[in-house]
From Swiss-Prot:
Spans annotated as Disordered: 614-654, 790-822
Key words, A-Z: Antibiotic resistance, Carboxypeptidase, Cell inner membrane, Cell membrane, Cell shape, Cell wall biogenesis/degradation, Glycosyltransferase, Hydrolase, Membrane, Multifunctional enzyme, Peptidoglycan synthesis, Protease, Signal-anchor, Transferase, Transmembrane, Transmembrane helix
Active site residues according to the UniProt entry: 86 (proton donor), 461 (acyl-ester intermediate)
Membrane disposition: Single-pass type II membrane protein
Annotated source species: Pseudomonas aeruginosa (strain ATCC 15692 / DSM 22644 / CIP 104116 / JCM 14847 / LMG 12228 / 1C / PRS 101 / PAO1)
Protein name: Penicillin-binding protein 1A
């Protein structure tokens, strides 16, 4: 009896001691516990996502893959699987499962250290949101106290929702929705019972039970959970049997971008980090860019096709490496280490036959490459020379060569190589500077250097329109005669002589400015710059957005020796396309928070709406040929009215600054249309459009090739060259390397679009001009042609020439900067 009494009081004492200890711990620790109320407004880390204007995913940035899911959207089968695996008493306890804690305590007494935590789902929520992974008594007590508070303040559904969105499930997947996408490539609601059980088994040990790394352990864990579900009555025998017999079919999935625009994605990422710092990667921001997915795809394909065409004109540089005599397994292992570059897949030649070659691709399949696709592969000697034409496949390849192939639309393979040259393309909406497409190189995987915004290159003759525009705003006209004749500059101090020349090494004598531009006569550009004066010209040109310190203070400026980026060129050319307004290229249209709230809406300077309406409504015809104007059907004013209405309902648009006379922009467009009609841009006539204007550009030794052009819908600039400047080849020019890319792209961009040119502004007249004098022609003058002028710049007739004056002289006597027009 005494013994029983002793045992009774001992138990009572122990229980009281535990209660007192727990109460003391609660009183001591509770003031420092975090507020459970914060869980109602918790902000989980969600990656940054970048989208096109039309909602296509471009890229995702962030360490954690997470897609939050609401409790109402969690499948009941998954809830049952999770409770069976982690906490089958979840519905009944108040945050702490005493039996589980007692079991954990017994293991501690037996082994001397903590083996299992005895944690409920609620306790895991407390740990995941508020505590560390440290294994200690104090942390466990904090966990218990927090769990009790959580159960008092949140519903069971809220607790489960917090849990399934926070847990780490391997392969950078946080939360069950992200895990379903990573392992099965579909949302959690579309998973089978077996697949849900597999994911429910991951929280315990994401690495050990990872189906990609440990399929055997993963299967055992899945089947154990299914058995628990059967015992607990969540599923019947039939569903259990079908689920355990289902094979593990998990594989690694990442959210595939719907649009390949990595250079755009990187531009958006950099801007977001500049705005929000490291939070850009975790706060679930959505960035909607100005890029149109169809135009971006066309731009990427145009650049790749153009570079491959150029590359094949200069011969085959040989295989990337040679692996003769190796086994098939060794070849396959090597291919597994190679990346696809710009859609060009690595392959190893396995056989060489008369009809072509057999190659092994990365999936281990052997496929044929026909001889027809290899005939271009003359040996590369230099950018100016090649070896003899190959006569058979054996002249090009041998077994063991690692080469590149390109999959064609019909499924066949084409023999190719990664181009050595690079390119950039940027296409803008001239009304506001929105970037509609941008390509910064052949392949982002090959090089993330964005040549569209980072490459400072000489633009060559594609810079001349800015010199000519300055001339038109300073007394010159499209009919002004300037002498295309040799000129020599001598630097007496440096004892140097500069003898600029035309590309053809020929000289045409006095010619009108219009002809000089479409024939790209260097001597005329230099003489025009002489007439303007360098400082006056530079002050004028900087209004287009060029940096003053990038513009040389000498007459080589007239030949395009400034250093500029394709982005700067495209932005500057927009001024001609929109009638004289300065717009700034931009790529982010809108930034949204994780819940869809608009945090930022672009409001760039825009061409005034009335100007857009006038341009669309006016049946302006083709200003490039004042003698025979052609009707060009506009898009109508509806689009412009919709733009205006949208702007009025969202924000007050910022009007763009006018930087050149509308008449100057109109006449420049006319002159640049002649570049395509009868000059260096004639290849663009293949598009069969009369509303296109543009200019080629080629620098010394053909180190850079350019083409910039536009209509009223898009301004597009293309550059081609080597990252380390070297010649593209003796017979390569802007018209052979850049213009074909521009034609491919604009052909798609303007497909099914009506002709769209700017309306003729008031204050322009058209006169018949004497080709010999550049003055108004008398009746019956042979070869007289029509030219357009500003009202105040109309030339007098030949009979009105004062004695001793030069025909066509553009500048008044009081502006007599040193000039040698003749």
């Amino acid at each position: 009896m005494r013994l029983l009494k002793f045992l009774w009081w001992t138990c009572v004492t122990l229980i009281c001691g535990v209660l007192l200890s727990f109460s003391g711990a609660y009183l001591y620790l509770s003031p420092s516990l975090p507020s459970v109320e914060a869980l109602r407004n918790v902000q989980l880390q969600i990656p940054l996502k970048v989208y096109s204007e039309d909602g296509k995913l471009i890229s995702e940035f962030g360490e954690m893959r997470r897609t939050p899911i609401r409790f109402a959207d969690i499948p009941q089968d998954f809830i049952h699987a999770l409770l069976s695996a982690e906490d089958d008493n979840f519905a009944n306890h108040y945050g702490v499962d005493v039996k589980s804690l007692m079991r954990a305590a017994a293991q501690l007494l037996k082994s001397g250290h903590i083996q299992t935590g005895g944690s409920t789902i609620t306790m895991q929520v407390a740990k995941n949101y508020f505590l560390t992974n440290e294994r200690s008594f104090s942390r466990k007590i904090n966990e218990i106290l927090l769990a009790l508070q959580i159960e008092r303040q949140l519903t069971k559904d809220e607790i489960l929702e917090l849990y399934v969105n926070k847990i780490y499930l391997g392969n950078r997947a946080y939360g069950i929705e992200a895990a379903a996408q990573v392992y099965y490539g579909k949302p959690i609601k579309d998973l089978s019972l077996a697949e849900m059980a597999m994911i429910a088994g991951l929280p315990k040990a994401p690495s050990r039970y990872n189906p990609l790394v440990n399929p055997t352990r993963s299967t055992e864990r899945r089947n154990w959970i299914l058995e628990r579900m059967l015992k607990l009555g969540f599923i019947d025998q039939q569903r259990y049997q079908a689920a355990v017999e289902e094979p593990i079919n998990a594989s690694y999935h990442v959210q595939t971008p719907e649009l390949n625009a990595p250079y755009i994605a990187e531009m958006a990422r950099a801007e977001m980090v500049g705005r929000y710092g490291s939070e850009a990667y975790t706060e679930g921001y959505k960035v909607i860019t100005t890029v149109r997915s169809d135009l971006q795809n066309a731009a990427s394909q145009s650049v790749r096709d153009g570079l491959i065409d150029y590359d094949q004109r200069h011969g085959y540089r040989g295989p990337e490496t040679r692996l003769p005599g190796q086994t098939r397994d060794a070849w396959l292992k090597h291919l597994g280490q190679q990346r696809s570059i710009g859609g060009l897949e690595p392959a190893i030649v396995t056989q060489v036959e008369k009809s072509g070659i057999m190659v092994m691709t990365r999936d281990g399949k052997e496929e044929a490459v026909t001889w027809d696709s290899m005939k271009w592969a003359r040996p590369f000697l230099s950018n100016n020379s090649m070896g003899p034409m190959p006569r058979q496949p054996a002249d090009v390849a041998q077994a063991g060569d690692q080469i590149r192939v390109q999959r064609q639309e019909d499924g066949t393979l084409r023999f190719v190589q990664i181009p050595a040259a690079q390119s950039a393309l940027i296409s803008l909406d001239p009304k506001d500077g929105a970037i509609r497409s941008l390509v910064g190189g052949f392949s982002f995987e090959q090089s993330n250097y964005n040549r569209a915004i980072q490459a400072k290159r000489q633009p060559g003759s594609s810079f001349k329109p800015f010199i000519y525009s300055a001339a038109l705003d300073n007394g010159f006209t499209a009919a002004s005669l300037v002498n295309d004749a040799p000129i020599v500059f001598v630097d007496e101090y440096l004892d140097k002589v500069w003898r600029p020349k035309n590309d053809t090494n020929t000289f045409l004598g006095p010619i009108p400015l219009r002809e000089a531009l479409y024939k790209s006569r260097n001597m005329v550009s230099i003489r025009v710059l002489q007439g303007l004066g360098i400082e006056r010209a530079i002050s004028y040109i900087t209004k287009f957005g060029f940096q003053r310190d990038e513009l040389p203070r000498n007459f080589s400026l007239a030949l395009g020796t400034a250093t500029v980026t394709p982005m700067e060129i495209a932005g500057a050319w927009s001024v001609f396309a929109n009638g004289g307004y300065k717009v700034n290229p931009y790529v982010i249209e809108r930034i949204e928070s994780r819940d869809g709230q608009v945090l930022y809406q672009a409001n760039p300077p825009r061409v005034p709406v009335e100007e857009q309406v006038a341009a669309d409504a006016e049946d302006a015809g083709n200003p490039g040929d004042p003698e025979h104007p052609e009707s060009a059907e506009g898009e109508g004013s509806i689009e412009a009215q919709q733009v205006a209405a949208k702007a009025q309902t969202t924000f007050e648009p910022t009007p763009a600054e006018r930087i050149i006379d509308a008449r100057t922009a109109y006449i420049m467009t006319s002159m640049l249309q002649d570049v395509i009609k009868r000059g260096t841009g004639r290849r663009a006539l293949a598009l069969k459009r009369t509303d296109l204007a543009g200019k080629t550009g080629t620098t010394n030794d053909s180190k850079d090739g350019w083409f910039s052009g536009y209509n009223s819908d898009y301004v597009t600039s293309v550059w081609v060259g080597f990252d380390q400047p070297e010649t593209l080849g003796r017979r390569e020019y802007g018209g052979t390397v850049a213009l074909p890319i521009w034609i491919r792209y604009m052909g798609f961009a303007l497909k099914d679009k009506p002709m769209h040119t700017m309306a003729e502004p008031p204050g322009i007249v058209s006169l018949r001009i004497d080709p010999v004098t550049g003055r108004s022609a008398a009746p019956g003058t042979p070869g007289a042609y029509f030219e357009m002028f500003k009202n105040e710049d109309t030339p007098p007739s030949v009979n009105e020439l004062p004695p001793g004056s030069f025909p066509g002289s553009p500048l008044p006597d009081d502006e007599g900067a040193p000039i040698d027009l003749f």
